[in-house]
Structure formats: structure tokens, C-alpha cells
Regions:
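Generic secondary-structure signature for well-ordered alpha-helical cores
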Residues: 84-87, 153-156, 162-169, 177-189, ...
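Active-site segments that bind and position negatively charged phosphate/pyrophosphate groups
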Residues: 197-306
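C-terminal charged capping/lid subdomain of soluble metabolic enzymes
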Residues: 2-4, 12, 179, 279-360
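A glycine/threonine-rich phosphate-anchoring loop and its flanking beta-alpha core
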Residues: 16, 107-199
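Non-catalytic interfacial helical region
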Residues: 77-96, 105-120
Length: 360
């Protein structure tokens, strides 16, 4: 079993990665005899597609399937179910699912009785390499993504790569958006490997190789979290592609575009701005452009660029009327750019809207 320690001063915990670790979950959770109750919070689709016999000892709370379920209303619904079920400050919440589940469970954990413990068992690739790690919790408002949230570290994270074999290929491709992000901002070797063997990787032909990639991404995320837990400086690098990506998700009302697709488009737009200001060379930009163009995408023929820009105005990374925008200086290197203008955003959105996408 691979173990990655997260040595935060007040909230140290461990990430456990192993194929089949989910089958040990009951014994792992019961190792701590101090928990009065253990509650599993998940989605029905996960219960329908994953062997969850190992969860039979615990009560289960079901939340909605869509990104729109990540809301204050959903959080209140979970809180009410916890109250009725006798949850107290010595209870443990288990977020079993993808990013929607872990974001919501982390948020509920941080506010219920002013904070109780939680652990994560991510079932999606995106969750395993990104959203379950780092302590950010969030729900969406009616107009913007992730603008209501807290910081609350989990007590542990249990990652079972075998869950990936239950996912449709679209979700694997979506998860690779975050992996490619790590490659672009901090790990050129990782990017080179993905670029050269992308189809084999998304087909999950070698799950041990995928497990190694997950380990590398977890280490990168942990490094950023240790350096900047509260997202004031270096951790902002992880937002590469997300300012534009979140705006697209909001524009489409979280319905016709997935988070992974939005991040792919957002990274293209961010690379475009990086090239515009000569942070990124033409050759590097063309290489990124060519690679991402091979990934199935949506048709944006009728996108309203001005309305997408309006969505950017609500981005949580905005401070004092400035955006902390992440640019690439090379493949594997990034920096924070503070002088981005509204015209830059509009040009990038227009570039995305008019990009020649070809679906595989």
C-alpha cells in the first residue's frame, strides 16, 4: 500500500492508495473506536455500479446526481438527515464518490455542530488526483461555482484505482484534464508521457501505470497544500485553466458541459493568453493546441462571449478588481499574472468559441 503523509501543523493526515483498499474500508474505519457513528454519504449511481457490500455496516445518505446538487439546499438536507439519525460531534462522515460528493461532504463536515470529522473515498479519477485532496470545501450559488465554502481537512483519504474500471470513458477523459494540468504547470515529464500515450492511458490498459500517475498527482497537490494551505499564493497555480473553465460551466448552467471539458477549454484559453503576452512560446502553444484538439469536445458555434465574460466577474479568484490569473511560461512551468484585462478574457473566450473542434 502506498501512503502519502500530509504533514499539516493542525490537520496532519494520510492518503492511502492501493488497488482493492475499499474492501478493507470497514476495518480501517473501525480502527478508531472513538467514533460514535459513521455515516456514508454518496449518490445512487455509485451504489448501482460499484460493489458496496463493504458499506453494509453503516447508514447511507443519498444526495442528488448533478453538479446542481452541490448547493446550500443539499447541504441543509444532509444536515437534517444527520440530525434525525443521531449524528453528534463524535461522528464521522464518509464522502464516497466524485467531486460533487466530496465537496459537499467536506462542507457539511465543516459546518455541522461547528465541525466534525470526515474521510474521503473518491471514486472518480478527478476526485483521486484533485478534488478530494487539500481541504477546500464548496457548494455553488445560483450564479457561480464554488463561491460558498470553507477549509476543512479530511482525517484520511482512501484511493482505490479499481473504481476507475466502473466508469465510462468520458469520465476517465475528464479526469485526465486535471492530470494534464499538473503536467503543464509543474511536471513536464508527466505531460510528455500523457501526450505520447494518451489513448492507452484512457483505455486503462495498465492500471498499475494509472496508479503511479495518481501517486504523482497526489504528491504534486500535497506539495502545493503544504506550501500554501489557505490558497494565498503558490496554491493558486492549481487554478490554471479554471477561471475560464468555471465561467463556461456557469454559462451552461452545469448541464451541457462537464467539469473536465470545461477545464480543457479553460487551459486552451489560458495558454492563448500566455502566448499573447509572450510568457509561452509559439512552439509550446502549438504543441498544447495540437494535443488537446484530439480530445472529444463540444460545439460552441452559438456561444455568447459577453455572457461568458459576465460569469467570470463572479470568480472567487478575483481580489480588489484584479484577477490572479495563471499563465504558462513553458510546458511544466507556470506563474501568476496580475495584469490581465477584460479584453484579454474576451479574446480568449472568442478563441475558444471559434476553435475548430473535431470529435473522435
Amino acid at each position: 500500500m502506498y501512503q502519502l503523509n500530509v504533514p499539516l501543523k493542525n490537520d496532519a493526515h494520510t492518503i492511502f492508495i492501493e488497488q482493492g483498499i475499499s474492501q478493507k474500508l470497514t476495518s480501517l474505519l473501525n480502527e478508531n473506536k472513538d467514533y460514535s457513528h459513521i455515516f456514508i454519504i454518496t449518490q445512487q449511481s455509485i451504489l448501482d455500479h460499484v460493489d458496496t457490500s463493504f458499506l453494509s455496516d453503516f447508514p447511507i445518505i443519498i444526495i442528488g446526481e448533478k453538479e446542481t446538487s452541490k448547493s446550500i439546499g443539499s447541504a441543509e438536507s444532509v444536515v437534517q438527515q444527520l440530525i434525525v439519525s443521531g449524528c453528534d460531534r463524535d461522528s464521522l462522515l464518509v464522502g464516497f464518490g466524485g467531486g460533487t460528493v466530496t465537496d459537499l461532504v467536506g462542507f457539511v463536515s465543516s459546518i455541522f455542530m461547528r465541525g466534525i470529522n470526515h474521510v474521503f473515498v473518491p471514486t472518480t479519477l478527478l476526485g483521486m488526483v484533485d478534488s478530494a485532496i487539500g481541504g477546500k470545501t464548496a457548494v455553488n450559488s445560483s450564479s457561480a461555482r464554488n463561491v460558498i465554502g470553507t477549509f476543512k481537512q479530511p482525517r484520511a483519504i482512501y484511493i482505490d484505482p479499481l473504481f476507475l474500471t466502473t466508469l465510462p470513458s468520458r469520465e476517465i477523459i475528464d479526469g485526465f484534464a486535471e492530470i494534464i494540468k499538473y503536467g503543464l504547470i509543474v511536471d513536464c515529464d508527466l505531460y510528455n508521457m500523457i501526450e505520447s500515450d494518451f489513448q492507452t492511458l484512457i483505455d486503462l490498459k495498465d492500471l498499475s501505470q494509472i496508479e503511479s500517475i495518481i501517486q504523482a498527482c497526489c504528491q504534486h497537490k500535497v506539495n502545493f497544500v503544504i506550501a500554501d494551505e489557505l490558497d494565498q499564493n503558490q496554491r493558486m497555480m492549481l487554478n490554471f485553466g479554471h477561471t475560464l473553465g468555471h465561467a463556461l460551466e456557469s454559462y451552461f448552467n452545469y448541464k451541457t458541459i462537464t467539469h473536465g471539458q470545461a477545464v480543457y477549454y479553460g487551459m486552451l484559453g489560458a495558454a492563448f493568453i500566455s502566448k499573447k503576452y509572450n510568457f509561452l512560446s509559439e512552439d509550446a502553444f502549438n504543441r498544447i493546441h495540437a494535443f488537446i484538439s484530439t480530445i472529444p469536445k463540444l460545439n460552441f458555434n452559438n456561444i455568447d462571449c459577453n455572457k461568458v465574460f459576465e460569469c467570470i466577474k463572479y470568480d472567487k479568484k478575483k481580489t480588489k478588481n484584479k484577477f490572479n490569473f495563471i499563465v504558462l511560461t513553458d510546458i511544466g512551468k507556470a506563474d501568476i499574472f496580475y495584469k490581465i484585462t477584460s479584453d484579454d478574457f474576451k479574446e480568449a473566450i472568442n478563441y475558444i468559441a471559434n476553435y475548430e473542434y473535431s470529435c473522435n
